């Protein structure tokens, strides 16, 4: 089995009546993204003639892993997914070696892959997505509001909740939250880890109320 399953078992043993162990893993979309970007595509094409066959294999591997970690007791699984942050960045076309139309195709491919990996999951398994924007050496990897992925990620990804970074102006406003569908939850990242200075408490509370207007 995957070594992450053993890692989870270690954390699971520390649970008590007030805690639920959560496992975080790279999202399927994050996985394929790294294989279809220009720097990797030539090597990927040695093994996969197109992205669909690659996505099918990735989805199958994730479904097997999800089943294994569920059997180990996991009931809260988080996809860490930098791909959506990259897709809204002003440099997205350069990152992916395509134009705006090509970006729309990639968005659909990533959404389809994530949903394929999730499909058939047990009803009592919570799966969330964290849209990570990078935090290497306390700096960010990409910028851009969520508007460009609202109708794919927020409206149509079949997760239970989104963990979204809104800790500075780079992430845009809360308006895209109107696209969140169904009874999905949103966890707001309003307190940054990129600097030591704490946010103003009243300011954070005000931003929570502002975000609530769109949900």
Feature map (PLM): residue ranges:
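Domain-level signal for soluble alpha/beta catalytic cores
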Residues: 1-215
């Amino acid at each position: 089995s995957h070594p992450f399953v053993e890692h989870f078992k270690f954390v699971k043993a520390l649970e008590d009546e007030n805690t639920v162990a959560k496992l975080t893993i790279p999202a399927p979309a994050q996985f394929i993204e790294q294989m279809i970007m220009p720097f990797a595509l030539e090597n990927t094409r040695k093994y996969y003639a197109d992205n669909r066959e690659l996505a099918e294999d990735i989805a199958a591997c994730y479904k097997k892993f999800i089943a294994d970690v569920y059997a180990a007791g996991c009931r809260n699984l988080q996809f860490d997914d930098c791909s959506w942050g990259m897709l809204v960045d002003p440099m997205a076309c350069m990152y992916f070696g395509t134009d705006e139309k090509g970006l729309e195709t990639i968005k659909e491919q990533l959404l389809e892959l994530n949903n394929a990996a999730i499909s058939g999951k047990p009803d009592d398994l919570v799966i969330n997505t964290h849209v990570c924007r990078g935090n290497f050496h306390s700096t960010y990897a990409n910028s851009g509001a969520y508007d460009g992925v609202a109708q794919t990620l927020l409206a149509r990804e079949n997760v239970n909740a989104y963990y979204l970074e809104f800790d500075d102006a780079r992430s845009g406003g809360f308006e895209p939250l109107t696209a969140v569908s169904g009874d999905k939850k949103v966890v707001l990242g309003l307190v940054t880890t990129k600097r030591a200075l704490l946010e103003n408490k009243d300011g954070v509370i005000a931003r929570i109320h502002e975000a609530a207007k769109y949900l």
